[in-house]
């Protein structure tokens, strides 16, 4: 859930696809989610993951009143914590506290929450809030987050998690 206006998310998806060689697309309402595909939440609306039936996931895209920010990382994390068996949350640079409530849902289910090291952020509000919530399993630099995701996704197994202690 990249906080970005709707005019910019298609180009952002194209840029990421070109830069990474991955299958990166902008999501849309009702889209079937496929393994190995990276989906960018469209700007100005919220994206949630639903599980219409066993082993099938779809994107529910609409604006919700629950959040002042669209797309909302909290709503995305909360829905994926309910719908998925082994989701991984990642909180990167950004202002405000979006993502910290969803991270708490992950922590309650013992799902991993990776957070960008605040010292490496352009704006450390979102990572700082997630850390302060006590719901974070690892605080890493972006390159370390990428390596961890590749390792976990390549292994196709649920990562073992443990909350880090915060002061």
Predicted regions and their residues:
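Conserved acid/base catalytic micro-environments in cytosolic active-site loops
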Residues: 1-167
């Amino acid at each position: 859930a990249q906080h970005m206006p709707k005019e910019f998310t298609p180009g952002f998806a194209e840029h990421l696809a070109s830069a990474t060689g991955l299958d990166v697309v902008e999501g849309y309402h009702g889209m079937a989610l496929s393994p190995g595909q990276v989906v960018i939440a469209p700007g100005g609306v919220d994206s949630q993951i639903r599980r219409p039936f066993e082993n099938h996931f779809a994107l529910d895209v609409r604006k919700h009143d629950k959040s002042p920010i669209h797309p909302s990382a909290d709503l995305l994390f909360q829905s994926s914590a309910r719908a998925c068996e082994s989701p991984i949350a990642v909180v990167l640079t950004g202002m405000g506290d979006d993502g910290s409530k969803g991270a708490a849902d992950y922590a309650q289910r013992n799902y991993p929450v990776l957070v960008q090291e605040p010292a490496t952020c352009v704006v450390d509000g979102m990572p700082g809030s997630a850390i302060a919530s006590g719901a974070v399993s690892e605080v890493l630099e972006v390159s370390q987050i990428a390596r961890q995701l590749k390792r976990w996704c390549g292994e196709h197994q649920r990562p073992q998690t443990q909350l880090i202690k915060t002061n």
